[in-house]
Curated annotation (Swiss-Prot):
This is ATP synthase gamma chain. GO terms for biological process: proton motive force-driven plasma membrane ATP synthesis. Coiled coil: none annotated. Produces ATP from ADP in the presence of a proton gradient across the membrane. The gamma chain is believed to be important in regulating ATPase activity and the flow of protons through the CF(0) complex. It is found in: Cell inner membrane. PANTHER family: ATP SYNTHASE GAMMA CHAIN, ATP SYNTHASE SUBUNIT GAMMA, MITOCHONDRIAL.
Length: 291
C-alpha cells in the first residue's frame, strides 16, 4: 500500500493548503469591506473641494492656476499606484500592461518619463524596465494616510507647476464591484476645464477671501489634486482586497476539487489492493483444496 500512503500524504498537504487559502479569503473579505468604506468616505471630500474651487474660478475668471495651463515640455510624469503584496490575481499585471503601452507610446515620440511609484509592485516594475523613478512610497498598510503620499506626489506636481512636464498621468485600478476592477491611466494634469465647471442649477456662493482669492485658489487646487491621488489609492486598495478574495476563493475551490480527485484515486487504489488480496486468498484456498 505504498501508493496509498503516498496519496494520503498528498491529500493531507492539499488540505493544509486549503485551510490557508480559506483563511486568507476570510481576511480579504474583512479588509475589502473596510477598504470600500474608506473609498466611499473619501469621495465627498474631493467633490466638495472641486465645487468650491469651481465657484472660486467662476468668480475670478482672470486668474488661471498653473495646474490649468498647458506646458510645452518634452517630458511626462506618471504616478503608478499598485499593491505591496501579490496573490491578487491579475490586478497588478493588467494595470502595468496598460502603463507599459502608454510608456512605449511616449518613448516612441521621444518624450522623457519621470515616475512616482506608490506600492512595491509598481516600484519593482519601474526598476526592472530602467525607468526614472523620482520618488516612491511603499508599505502604506491597510489604512493609507495622505501625509505619506504628499511628499512623493508633490515632486511631480511641483515639476508640472514649473513647466518641466507637459502632463501628469495617474494610473490605478478602479473599483467597479467585488468581481470587476478596471485598470486606468488617466490624465491628472493639466486639469480638464470640465472638471472645474459649476454644474447647472448649483447655487453660487460669494466668498470673503483671506488673504486673497489667488492664494485660496492655489491652495484649494493643490488639495484637490492630492485628494484625487488619495482617492485613487483608496480605489486601488479596495480593488486589491476584492481581487485577492476572489483569487483565494478560486484557490480554495480548486483545492477542494483536487482533494476529491485524490480521494477517488485513493479509494480505487485501496479497492484494487483489497481485490488483489481476496483473489490471492481464494486462489490459495482452491490450490489447498485440490491437494
Amino acid at each position: 500500500m505504498a501508493a496509498g500512503k503516498e496519496i494520503r500524504g498528498k491529500i493531507k498537504s492539499v488540505e493544509n493548503t486549503k485551510k490557508i487559502t480559506k483563511a486568507m479569503e476570510m481576511v480579504s473579505v474583512s479588509k475589502m469591506r473596510k477598504a470600500q468604506e474608506r473609498m466611499r468616505a473619501a469621495r465627498p471630500y474631493s467633490e466638495k473641494i472641486r465645487n468650491i474651487a469651481a465657484n472660486l474660478g467662476k468668480a475670478n475668471p482672470e486668474y488661471t492656476h498653473a495646474f490649468m495651463k498647458k506646458n510645452d515640455a518634452k517630458a511626462l510624469g506618471f504616478i503608478i499606484v499598485t499593491s505591496d503584496k501579490g496573490l491578487c490575481g491579475g490586478l497588478n499585471t493588467n494595470l502595468l500592461r496598460a502603463v507599459t503601452a502608454k510608456l512605449r507610446e511616449a518613448q516612441a515620440a521621444g518624450v522623457a518619463i519621470e515616475s512616482v511609484a506608490i506600492g512595491s509592485k509598481g516600484l519593482g516594475f519601474l526598476n526592472r524596465i530602467g525607468a526614472r523613478v523620482v520618488a516612491h512610497v511603499t508599505h502604506l498598510g491597510d489604512t493609507p494616510h495622505l501625509d505619506k503620499l504628499i511628499g512623493p506626489v508633490k515632486t511631480l506636481l511641483d515639476a508640472y507647476a514649473e513647466g518641466k512636464l507637459s502632463a501628469v498621468y495617474l494610473s490605478y485600478t478602479k473599483f467597479i464591484n467585488t468581481i470587476k476592477q478596471e485598470p486606468l491611466v488617466e490624465q491628472l494634469l493639466p486639469l480638464a476645464e470640465d472638471s472645474l465647471k459649476v454644474e447647472e442649477g448649483q447655487h453660487s456662493w460669494d466668498y470673503i477671501y483671506e488673504p486673497d482669492a489667488q492664494s485660496v485658489i492655489d491652495e484649494l487646487l493643490v488639495r484637490y489634486v492630492e485628494s484625487l491621488v488619495y482617492q485613487a489609492v483608496a480605489e486601488n486598495m479596495a480593488s486589491e482586497h476584492s481581487a485577492r478574495m476572489v483569487a483565494m476563493k478560486a484557490a480554495t475551490d480548486n483545492a477542494g476539487n483536487v482533494i476529491s480527485e485524490l480521494k477517488l484515486v485513493y479509494n480505487k487504489t485501496r479497492q484494487a489492493g483489497i481485490t488483489k488480496e481476496l483473489s490471492e486468498i481464494v486462489s490459495g484456498a482452491a490450490a489447498a483444496a485440490g491437494v
